[in-house]
Amino acid sequence: MANPKRRWSKARTGKRRSQWKLASPTLVSCPQCHVFKLPHRVCGECGYYDGKQVVKVEAK
C-alpha cells in the first residue's frame, strides 16, 4: 500500500480545512401566518403550501 512521502504542514492542512463550513438554512416567511419556514415545504404552523391548505394542523 502507498504511504505519504512527506508530512503535510499545519498551514496546508489548515488551508484545506478552512473551506469546511456549515451553510445557514435559507428561511422564508409563510404568506398565510408569517412564520419563518424552509422554502418549498409545507408550513408547520398553518399547514399551507402554495396558497392551499395541504395538512390539517391541530390547535395547540
From Swiss-Prot:
Show the SUPFAM superfamilies listed in the entry: Zn-binding ribosomal proteins (SSF57829)
Name its GO BP terms in alphabetical order.
translation
Query: Belongs to which family?
Result: Belongs to the bacterial ribosomal protein bL32 family.
UniProt keywords (A-Z) are: Ribonucleoprotein, Ribosomal protein
Question: Which segment of the chain is annotated as a signal peptide?
Answer: none
User: Which Pfam families does the record associate with it?
Assistant: Ribosomal_L32p (PF01783)
Has the keyword Kinase been applied to this entry?
no
Metal-binding as UniProt keyword: no
Q: Give the protein's recorded name.
A: Large ribosomal subunit protein bL32
Gene Ontology terms for molecular function: structural constituent of ribosome
User: What organism does this protein naturally occur in?
Assistant: Ruminiclostridium cellulolyticum (strain ATCC 35319 / DSM 5812 / JCM 6584 / H10) (Clostridium cellulolyticum)
Encoding gene, per UniProt annotation: rpmF
Q: Which HAMAP family match?
A: Ribosomal_bL32
Q: GO CC terms on record?
A: large ribosomal subunit
